[in-house]
């Protein structure tokens, strides 16, 4: 265990839900996966933990961990998804704060609780190389040989007409086709809209015969528990034949995240998905959101979606790769428990695919 540097202190599980959301919105790197609702729905209230790091009494970093323990032995894992949060809004981010918060996380969950700590920070390969050094110096190693997934980040600080001009020619043509259709946009955050979207999403999943990467019903429950200012944005596109496309986006911090998209069988010719994405960008611009994360690309396994997102991002879209997951542990029992649990989960997943 290493003490935090002078002037820094940490607190664990000393914050209530309402206060957590107030703190969450103070960080530019805040996101859906660090919301109280996400952790509670995914793991249950008893299995989430909240850590604060303070400098001279002022909160400068926070992290929500999801705790999973093996029965009886008490060993297990603490997982920080898309965290910790340490980049303040409207102020320069300090890498030293990142050091202090991952040290505090390690002190609590590795040293005090004997868990395997795994973090998935919002850091990219093209970020300063100092972060890899900090992670190593604070006792973290990359989780196996795993490297992070790729995504495309759009900079929304440019004028709207410049963003439109940056769209690749194919995307511009499809958007013009959609704008000539008699399409109606329905938007909001109500549960009724989520239900309509799920019906369309399930139809698309069945048509394309692919396995859902995320449990859409789980996200609906999360939406019901999120406070108004943190709820996901739902946008639906209706043609004369009915609902033709939809999307769900999360805006908690300075980066909007594209979570789900769907197109109905009858709506495939309307190009509604192009119109929705552009209307979403207009809405994000009005809210002064700085960036739009198109949330995952894989040219090999999903070339169609990759092309759609690449063309939307345009020549100035930032194609980035996350640094990946990092972990730290001092307990052989926790390492063994997590390894067995993940192996069983992988086997169960393989059996479900058959």
How should each PLM-predicted stretch be described?
Residues 1-9, 14, 67, 135-161, ...:
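Active-site/acyl-donor-binding loops of N-acyltransferases
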Residues 119-129, 294-303:
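Conserved beta-strand-loop-alpha-helix junction that forms the acyl-donor binding cleft
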Residues 79, 96-107, 218-335:
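Aromatic (often tryptophan-rich) hydrophobic motifs at membrane interfaces
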